[in-house]
Design a protein with these regions (language model features):
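Conserved N-terminal beta1-alpha1 strand-loop-helix module at the mouth
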Residues: 1-193
Length: 193
């Protein structure tokens, strides 16, 4: 999650495929007003993802309508009915996060009605990877998260996920670090060439 004007400046310079604003928890959380101000300075060609945990459709809709976010990422206990409601009401793509500890978790994620699934270790934000061998023959686009950093960026990219979702692995002392951001993106882009 991006929280400071410098994070936005770096993202605009480095051009990731997505940028995120966290609207849940304590770490990296931004208010609606903070996110709106940050979004104004983010390159309009970079879609902003709003990260939510068991939030209301009304709150998500307010952020979509304001142009603060273009994609909704759900990290709570949201079921397929909520995923359908978000997609149909807000007309934006939905990413649903799943904690992966077993092959059954992967199968459950694969059956989600979300546009994309995000596969993570635990509740997210732990800095730990799950066992990537569990991915096996996953047959749908997925975001890979959990424990990603510049040191394992190439190995993660080699799994051919739709996207990599990195946060704590590009931070120093809990804040985004431009050099780590740059290194992570350079390694992923070099691999994909």
């Amino acid at each position: 999650g991006l929280t400071r004007p410098c994070d936005i400046a770096w993202a605009t310079e480095l051009r990731p495929d997505y940028a995120g604003f966290v609207f849940a928890g304590k770490k990296r959380r931004v208010s609606d007003d903070q996110a709106a101000a940050l979004r104004k300075d983010l390159d309009p060609g970079i879609p902003a993802v709003g990260v939510f945990v068991d939030d209301s459709l009304e709150h998500m809709g307010k952020l979509v309508a304001a142009g603060t976010i273009q994609i909704v990422q759900l990290h709570g206990q949201e079921d397929d009915a909520m995923i359908d409601a978000v997609r149909q009401s807000l007309q934006v793509p939905v990413i649903k996060a799943f904690s992966i500890a077993s092959q059954d978790d992967v199968r459950k994620a694969e059956q989600s009605r979300a546009d994309y699934i995000l596969l993570d270790h635990g509740a997210g934000g732990t800095g730990d990877c799950f066992d990537w061998a569990l991915l096996g023959q996953l047959n749908r686009p997925y975001f890979l998260a959990g424990g990603l950093n510049p040191d394992n960026a190439v190995q993660a990219a080699a799994l051919h996920p739709y996207a990599l979702d990195v946060s704590s692995g590009i931070e120093t002392d809990g804040m985004k670090d431009k050099e780590k951001m740059k290194l992570f993106m350079a390694r992923v882009r070099a691999y994909r060439r």
